[in-house]
Curated annotation (Swiss-Prot):
This is Protein nucleotidyltransferase YdiU. Belongs to the SELO family. Nucleotidyltransferase involved in the post-translational modification of proteins. It can catalyze the addition of adenosine monophosphate (AMP) or uridine monophosphate (UMP) to a protein, resulting in modifications known as AMPylation and UMPylation. The active site is at D246 (proton acceptor). InterPro entries: adnlytase_SelO, SelO. The keyword Lyase does not apply. The gene is ydiU. ATP binds at G84, G86, R87, K107, D119, G120, R170, R177, D256.
Length: 478
């Protein structure tokens, strides 16, 4: 089957990119590709037989027209000015059979005009982390970019140490970022901001294109998508680590996996980025940061969208987020209805977990085994203050009984939203260290496991992390 690529970005937004081709790596080797995703995109298996080929930037497929995008952004609250694709190149937009499109974006593709002080390369460590994280999030049901392939090489890349250069093929419906809009707003080119908005509406919100109120309705939906995404992050214990405005997806996708982390111990102020000294992007601050970022996006639209309309959309953010968060947390607790004491029960559980540094994922998974008429629970053994747990658990079981739902039905619901497996940093690190020694078995094994996060397991993928695994520090270097 012939793949079809179109050039909407190149044709319709001529001042938002620089056209250039990838710079291949030395002795590139394909070490992993996403068979399931490739099948979804109708990519023939024969394409993966050329280990470097398009995956390593050596060739282009017919219809591809590679370019590096320019955008700007706020980083840690500070205006950073022009940024852009410093090591990534958009190879093309694949046109799928249903009329939708998928960007093919090659990360680690070499120097671009937006590389600033960088070398345009990515290392094997970071490409493995992003491939694992994006696929883990996808199978958790959270909107995200996807990973299609990883190529390693003999090209040395200099970070804190010398590491092997690598490339990741990332795919997504769009790479539109808040930072694209900021770039032209701060250059005082509001007509180009409007062109970006029109492009987004035309291709991703086409049902609004002929509506005279299209900009207000569109921004309302951007706010809603962002609120929903952040709510989902919070419920699975995901910390992004670098929520700069240039890393915010207009479509509400999880974008740019750098120093991310999933909660091990329940620590509301968890900071996964060792460069975040003030805790700007801590786990519990993510909802507020996302709203701040939306306010920056709204500012760029103010030349052609009424300020009252923008503020009305921003004012809806908190309620949308709380609605999505509340619905998912009630499911995680096994509540079939909404009752006034639900928030108090959840907050008391969080307080108990924080005091005891309980494992976030394991606590909710074990809670899924609760029988409403039995005081026995394997979760009890996880707590030191058994009296405090017993008091909370008795009230929790009383709340379950109000719903008049069988244990089996409730347990099935809870186990479908409380994963047994999340991508803990130590699991990723183990796969990385093996891969850097030439052993790709753990990378493939972990990828396969992450496809079924809600299935029970009896291996170390679902155990508490070792002490060294909790102390892993992750930086933005990639």
């Amino acid at each position: 089957m012939t793949l079809s690529f179109i050039t909407r970005w190149r044709d319709e937004l001529p001042e938002t990119y620089t056209a250039l081709s990838p710079t291949p790596l030395n002795n590139a080797r394909l070490i992993w590709h996403n068979t399931e995703l490739a099948n979804t995109l109708s990519i023939p298996s024969s394409l993966f037989k050329n280990a470097a080929g398009v995956w390593g930037g050596e060739t282009l497929l017919p219809g591809m027209s590679p370019l590096a995008q320019v955008y700007s952004g706020h980083q840690f609250v500070v205006w950073a000015g022009q940024l852009g694709d410093g090591r990534g190149i958009l190879l093309g937009e694949q046109l799928l059979a249903d009329g939708t499109t998928m960007d093919w974006h090659l990360k680690g593709a070499g120097l671009t005009p937006y590389s600033r002080m960088g070398d345009g390369r990515a290392v094997l460590r970071s490409t493995i982390r992003e491939s694992l994280a994006s696929e883990a999030m996808h199978y958790l049901g959270i909107p995200t970019t996807r990973a299609l392939s990883i190529v390693t090489s003999d090209s040395p890349v200099y970070r804190e140490t010398v590491e092997p250069g690598a490339m990741l093929m990332r795919v997504a419906p769009s790479h539109l970022r808040f930072g694209h809009f900021e770039h032209f707003y701060y250059r005082r080119e509001p007509e180009k901001v409007r062109q970006l908005a029109d492009f987004a509406i035309r291709h991703y919100w086409s049902h609004l294109e002929d509506d005279e109120d299209k900009y207000r309705l569109w921004f309302n939906d951007v706010v809603a998508r962002t609120a929903s995404l952040i709510a989902q992050w919070q419920t699975v214990g995901f910390a992004h680590g670098v929520m700069n405005t240039d890393n915010m997806s207009l479509l509400g996708l999880t974008l740019d996996y750098g120093p991310f982390g999933f909660l091990d111990d329940y620590e509301p102020g968890f900071i996964c980025n060792h460069s975040d000294h003030q805790g700007r992007y801590s786990f519990d601050n993510q909802p507020a940061v996302a709203l701040w970022n939306l306010q920056r996006l709204a500012q760029t639209l103010s030349p052609f969208v009424a300020v009252d309309a923008l503020n009305e959309a921003l004012d809806s953010y908190q309620q949308v987020l709380l609605t999505h968060y509340g619905q998912r947390m009630r499911q995680k607790l096994g509540f079939m209805t909404e009752q006034k004491e639900d928030n108090a029960l959840l907050n008391e559980l969080f307080s108990l977990m924080a005091r005891e540094r309980s494992d976030y994922t394991r606590t909710f998974r074990m809670l899924s085994l609760t029988e409403q008429h039995s005081a026995a629970s394997p979760l009890r053994e996880e707590f030191i203050d058994r009296a405090a747990f017993d008091d909370w658990f008795a009230r929790y079981r009383g709340r379950l009984q109000q719903d008049e739902v069988s244990d089996s039905e409730r347990q099935q619901l809870m186990q479908s939203v409380n994963p047994a497996l999340v991508l803990r940093n130590w699991l990723a690190q183990r796969a990385i260290e093996a891969a850097e020694k030439g052993d790709m078995m753990e990378l493939h094994r972990l990828h396969e496991a992450l496809r079924n996060p809600f299935s029970d397991r009896d291996d170390d993928y679902v155990s508490r992390p070792p002490d060294w695994g909790k102390r892993l520090e992750v930086s933005c270097s990639s």
